[in-house]
Amino acid sequence: MSTLKKCFSTVAFSALLLGGTLSAQEPDFDLSAQRSEIQTVAPVPGCRLDHGGIVINPTPQQMGIDSTQRLDISRGLCLKDPAGCFAEDVDFVKLADKGPRLEILFGAKRAARQGVKPVSGAYRLTVDARGVTITGYDECGAFYGLQTLRQLIASPASAGGRIPHVTVNDYPDLPSRGVVEGFYGTPWSHEVRMSLIDFYGRFKLNTYIYGPKDDPYHSCPNWRKPYPEQEAMQIRELVDACRRNRVDFVWAIHPGQDIRWNEEDYRNLVGKFERMYELGVRSFAIFFDDISGEGTDPERQVALLNRLTEEFVRAKGDVAPLVVCPTDYSRLWANPTPQGSLSIYGRKLDPSVRVFWTGDVVCSDLTPETLEWVDSRICRPAYFWWNYPVTDYARHIMLQGPVYGLDTTLTAQQVCGIASNPMEHGEASKLALYGVADYAWNVEAYNALDNWERGLGELIPEAREAYRTFAIHSADTESGYRRDESWETRTFRLDEWTAPAAAALRAEFERVEQAPAILEARCTNRALLGELRPWLEEFARLGARGLRALDLMEAFRAGADDAAFWPQYEANLMSAAERRSYEAHRSGTMKLQPFYQQAMDDMGYGWMERMLGRKPMTLRGIGSFASAHTLQTRQMFDNDSTTYYTSGISQKPGDWIGVDLGGVHGVGEVLVLQGRNSTKDVDYFDHAVLEYSVDGRQWSPLLDELDKQYVVRWTGSPVEARYVRLRCLDSKRTNHVAIRSFEINPLHADRLSARLSGPDAGDESRLPYAFDERLDTSLPLSGTLELSVRPGTEQYTLLMGGLDAPVRIEQLSADGEVLKRDETGNSFFRFAVAKGTATLRVTGDVEIFEVIAR
């Protein structure tokens, strides 16, 4: 018998079970008027550029190219390194005793004569007939000049070892550019960290902040303890790798949850810093984020930071200024008054200490407005902690889209740096970090789309197009921080079908289905492939079911015979196991999977209307949150109390979550399960009203003034309604909202004129799924289903699946006589009711999707 389809427990066929904007057929419902905020997904800015065969990242500030003149380096370059600093950094070029020179110089005076900007990391690179000359403002600048040369040599324009003459005058816009390993979840392996550090150096990122939330020696209760020998050795290796790549290794500590504001813990903290100093660490950060209790006191935080600055940083002489992540790191909950912690920082914190800031919310864009707000309070340019591409709040997503949402008018006087918080998938985070490096170096010139196109070729040049196919459909978070996805793909509903649109979409689904195999065969970065593989496997399945959905749509539009249509339709339904696998590793969430789901729903709705002779009820999630308009709302209807829809952003009075029934129906029972559980969860409306409406404009209460209720149940005389919702009333709660179940008129097994016998006897909880008028639910039968035949019933249709052996159908009289017996091996079976039949009996090992009486 095949894997069971997912079981549900409401009385509606979910033809439109997915959350989304209302269809054009319902223009009278003003959904936007019911929403608490405008929800948009900003498009990716920029355009793809022709770089003439020269690809340099980050984009240089100034670059002149003379492609008519070439320097032949095929026989090697003669290294001139008077400072003796770069012998290990020129492994990308052949060296020779004679020939064109590669001269590497640095120093403020030399740089000034060459017109190099007097900032750390600035350099001038010249390629002419005499050879290559790099002049850095400092050693770091000269190293960056080498990284530009490395990319120039690797560019298509330099094929055959003949480099075009160029002049590059370059410098970084932001002083601090890098990564904060600050996510929750599985920390990176040592090998991944080492790989990433090389990546940082190659693309001119100069900061790596080591602060894994799940490193026990970084946070409480073990922050006071030294690292064990093996872990300490790895820290030293990371420090050495950073030094080779001219990256500042910043070791962060997270002591706030259990710190005691006394001399003993101050000494514990200094002692830990001393041990890290012995391992080579010369930069330190203290995180006071995500804590409660005494550790949140900003006065004590400032006193600690100032004392450490004086007694440790300045006393050492070779330690960089401290970095702090405040408790109020987001405007969402920061106290804006002069008594707030940020204002206290501004008045009392040593000016050398850099202060992290995540923006208006935890995951948000970098804008002049958010910087003006925070800078005016902390009295210094903020250090932007960008929570992208981190997915610790959405681990089912692999973010591979463009880097955007970073304002291109900002200067170092507004923001002192940017630190990207990546995914726990370090190799797969490189695509986003490629963009962060580009932005932070040359802010005004940053072109998000072009950078992404270049980054794809950098990471997987041997299978760039296949990687692009996956990446463009694996970009949205489905949460509060939405990202554009599938922007080149046009999908459509069943009633919008055109042959050209279907052909274009078919071609895309074919690329989707084929891309994983191409990547598996060609990608040489096996570590990256290993991180992507679970998503790629699901991506191939998504492509296959999208293609089958297109085939089904064509057959449905052509008026396919019912008996021929159903087996194909049933075969393309996702099983419970398939859905769980997809939910764990989602892609195509903005367009591709919704297309599949809507196509199946639209066909199923139209087909069931034909089967029933009337319009069935539908269930579709709606609400005031952006995530209420994605497939996530299906979690409210999946009959699984361990899954839930989540708003993904904070709630406020007036917000709501509800159900669209697709038309006006009698509603006599509503059951809502709030929260991720029904015990002590905080993600729920603690003050709410349950309402219904016919038109979406005028609402009437079913249950008013609900106070701290996880389980919301209403039964009563049926009311006419199309919409039912749970709306937040006045409340100080700012948590997310989670809904595990939103049931309308649920069927109850004990009220059905049907029973199970054989192995299934005694467990009739799934019995309603054979009668709920939904094609995405099913009754797994291993025995006999017996049901009473209503007077006047002339015909039955059985919709089945997973037939490994014939199913027996018997019609019995009131006294138990078998009037007719049939056997079928077909999943679609329609038969007439014999005269005098009182009971129908179905026996076999089969999935019953629906028993339809006419």
Where are each of the predicted segments found?
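Feature activates predominantly on carbohydrate-active enzymes
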Residues: 67, 82, 86-88, 111-272, ...
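Bacterial N-terminal signal peptides
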Residues: 10-19
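Catalytic-core regions of glycoside hydrolase
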Residues: 138, 154, 182-183, 278-282, ...
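Short beta-strand-plus-loop segments that form exposed binding edges in beta-rich domains
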Residues: 726-734, 841-847
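Disordered, acidic Ser/Thr/Pro-rich linker "stalks" and the adjacent N-terminal cap
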Residues: 604, 609-667, 673-688, 696, ...
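C-terminal functional modules
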Residues: 31-35, 56, 448-618
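Acidic, contiguous N-terminal accessory segments
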Residues: 24-129, 135-137, 158-168
